[in-house]
Each structure stands twice: as C-alpha cells, then as structure tokens.
Amino acid sequence: MRDALPDAPTPVYSGYPDGYERAKWHIKHGLEVFNEHFAAKPRGVWLSEGALSSAAVGLLDEFGFKWTASGEGVWRHSCEASHIDQHDLHSKKALYQPLQHSSQNCALFFRDDGLSDLIGFQYKDWHPQDAANNFVHNMENIANFLGDAVDEHVVTVILDGENAWEYYPDNASHFLTALYDKLSSHPRVEMTTFSDALDKGAKLRHLPVLKAGSWVYGSFSTWIGEADKNKAWDLLVEAKQCFDKVMATGELSAEKTLQATLQLAICEGSDWFWWFGDYNPSDSVRDFDRLYRRHLAKLYELLGEVPPPSLDIPLSQGGGQMENAGTMRRN
C-alpha cells in the first residue's frame, strides 16, 4: 500500500496475515478452475483491476505466466521512477512497447487510457460508423508516429468485458460490427493478443522500477486508504486471525476445513472494497456492505465461532453518483 498511497490513512492492522500464501492459493485455485473449463493453462493473467507490484509480478513468474497488464497510471509512475527517456514518456512511445521489470520474466503491457476510455465512455453517444472511423483514425496516427519501428510495438486497449456495452444502443452490436469490419481489412493495423504479439517479436523494454498500483487512478485507492475501506480490512484481518487460530487446532473435519477455506476466499474478494466509499450509489453500497458482513459472519460460523458484534454495524453509506453506476472508472 505504501508504495502506491504513501500519505493515505491505513487500517489498524499493518498487514494481512499470510497474505503472500493466500495470493498463491487464489492463483492456484484460479488455474484449476480455468483448466477445468478449458483444459489448458492460460499464458497470461489480468489481476484484479490490473493491480501490479514487484512482488505480484514475482508471484506470476513463479506460476509461469508470460504476460500481465495494467493501466497507464502505473506505466507513467513506473517510467518516471525509472527515468525513462522524457520524449518516449511524454509522447507515450514507451507505452506501446511491452516492458520487463528488473530481472523478472513476465512481460508487462499497459493500457492506452485515451483509446480505451473512448470505447468505455464516449462512443456510446456516437453514430457507430463515426465511432469506428475515429478509432481507426487514432490507430493510424499512432502507426505514423511510430514510423519504421511500428512492427515492434503494440497498442493496448483494455476495458471491462461486459460493463460498457449496456450503455450502447443494441449492446454495441452496430459499433462492434463496424469496428471489426474496418480493423480486419485494414492494411496497417493488425489485431492481436498479448501472447501472439510476444510470439511475433514485440520488442521488450527494460523497466528498472515498477511502482505499485492499478488501472484505477494508478493507485490502490479503490480498495484501501479511506475510513470505510480500512474498517472493512480490519474486519477481514480479524476474521483471518480467527481462521488461523481454529485451523491450528486441527479440530475441524476435512469437509468443514474445505468449506471454511472457500468461504475465506469469498471474503477476500477485491470487489467488496471497491464498493465501499461515499462516491458510489447508496443502494449498491448498502447491498455490498450487507453481503460482505454476512459472508464474514458465515466464515465465523463455519469455524464454530460466534460472529463478533462489529459485523452488525454498517460500514459504508455511499451517496455518490459515479459514472456508469460505479461499475467502471474513467482515467
């Protein structure tokens, strides 16, 4: 937290018990679920809200991931700390090259916030053909700027997979059809995936310093650093301490141990903390607040413990009117 939010208020507890091991558990479990559905191992991963740190990338290396991605804020903070060439920084030329942090292997791709937010927030109000033409025009401008080295570069567009389309007419079917028609036949713009781009020789650039943060404002502020969010963390830490104490006794059956472990994983989900705060709509905050506290109470019950009275007290009220009902953040 301190690397991303050095001046923000902190929870009472200074860290999450065995956080690194819990992160490994979630990745391992995620890989098992992925393999169950697709009978394959993914080559890359998008961590929650593109949250990155040096430790997180090191963990991805342990699991053999070839790529991950984040937002332009993390890229900019990292480039500034790494003293990347000022022209490449301010012109965003360095944004269009995958980076490799220190001695780590995992390639890092960073989102073009401008292009991505056009799709996420602006084009919904445009005529589909005009929007598609504008996007392709922007891509052509980038290609012209990159010049002869264009083949070594990748323009990264990332947005929430489902949240944008409900704000378009007909779930964006007209816009997407027009866009893919233009891109698929364009002589200079090639659609690709991160894995294919790496296989085809996208040039990796060294990044000495990786600043921690996410694609939301380039920090971890969507999860921590405000009173409501910090209190939610303290409740989770106390539940984890209880979990560890009960597990150390070895008294739970194998079935109860599994149930409690899976319930803990639900409580550790990042989206709970996303919703807490006065900037989100009250109805949504109220629902997520109540559900979060209920899930924590269920964890205590599975452990054979009485839920603490603190779980009866609401954490957050909301009251804001975030764009797109708070499901996406504009950068």
Residue ranges and their predicted role:
Residues 1-6, 53:
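Aromatic-lined carbohydrate-binding surfaces of glycoside hydrolases
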Residues 20-47, 140-158:
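CE4/NodB-like, metal-dependent polysaccharide N-deacetylase domain
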Residues 4-28, 61-101:
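Acidic, His- and aromatic-enriched active-site or binding-groove loops in soluble protein domains
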Residues 84-119, 123-331:
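Active-site and substrate-binding clefts of carbohydrate-active enzymes
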Residues 13-15, 36, 80, 126, ...:
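A generic short-segment signal for beta-strand/edge and adjacent turn/coil regions
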